[in-house]
């Protein structure tokens, strides 16, 4: 009984630590891309092209499961906005929805026997679809003009380098840390 309680405490501690690390990475990594944008004169282009905040969400979800992924996805954009003003207030709720879905879906697929790239792709499709639905509801249902429905397709096109980065980097990272799975199960 005591071993079981000790093990459960270890799992909770590992998941809490992973959540904090995931949120930290999801807030810090985009700042590097913003600095690159400032130095190169491209502004926010590197951030919107490479989608750096998404990496931490996918990684923590695939490592520690759906609760960790969903919390990381919901909190990261909110904390980033509070600290840096990015993403913009208009995009914040939609990004929170999208990243929460990413974290939840990837976390639910964590132990499924399928390639990492398919787990990520499934989460990307569902996350973008739900984000698109939220944008359409805001625009047509609530008559909000803060975000136009044209952003749905334009963000996919501009974020293609980030999607490719996620498809290549995440399987490699998870392969490198596969021994850490013992801390979450």
Where are these regions (language model features)?
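Hydrophobic transmembrane alpha-helices
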Residues: 2-62, 67-68
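Hydrophobic alpha-helical transmembrane segments
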Residues: 16-21, 55, 66, 70-74, ...
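Membrane-embedded alpha-helical hairpins and interfacial helices in multi-pass inner-membrane proteins
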Residues: 34-47, 51, 85-93, 112-185
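Hydrophobic core segments of transmembrane alpha-helices in multi-pass, intramembrane catalytic enzymes
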Residues: 53-57, 95-102, 166
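Helix-adjacent hinge/juxtasegments
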Residues: 71-108
